[in-house]
Amino acid sequence: DSAGSIYFSDSGSSKVRRIGVGGDIAVVAGNGDFADHGDGGSALEAGVRSPGGLAIGPDGALYIVEQTSHRIRKVDTGGTISRKAGNGMPGYGGDGGMAVEAGIKGPFRMVFDQQKNIYFSDRDNNRIRKIDTNGIIHTVAGHSNIGWVQDGLEVHITVHNFP
């Protein structure tokens, strides 16, 4: 983050932790429950299930990929956790609609671009997806077939193997 802290997923304990610049370690999300509850409340009291990829957004918030909950969550700078993408059920769908209502399956990693959009690997759907600044989800690469990236094809018809 902007203070120089390092964040990491502690999947085994269902928590996300921060190492401060002084070396102190603190929990920033998850109460240890292997569950997915607590949206709208304190991130420290929420269940965080299978935390994986992490990113600090341009808003200073921490974004957490939850692989087995099939969603992406956000911890704002005040410590409140909320759902950013995924309806919590494994599946695929929702392009052109709100990301919080979309079906995603096994999200894995994410990154922000300079326009503040989120790109993430919808790994078990073999797709790369985007959440725009209005909260709308789009598929930008891949389709449901498993395979290898084929050079020279248009990005929306390429085949990926668990990106």
Q: What is the predicted function of each stretch?
A:
Residues S14-R18, D24, H70-K74, T80, ...:
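A short loop-to-beta-strand structural motif that recurs across blades of beta-propeller domains
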Residues S11, Q67, R123:
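Short loop/turn segments immediately following the C-termini of beta-strands
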Residues S5-Y7, A61-I64, N117-F120:
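Conserved beta-propeller blade signature
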Residues D1-I6, F162-P163:
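Low-complexity/repetitive intrinsically disordered segments
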Residues D1-A3, I56-D59, F112-Q115:
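Residue-level detector of Asp-centered blade-edge/turn motifs that repeat once per structural unit
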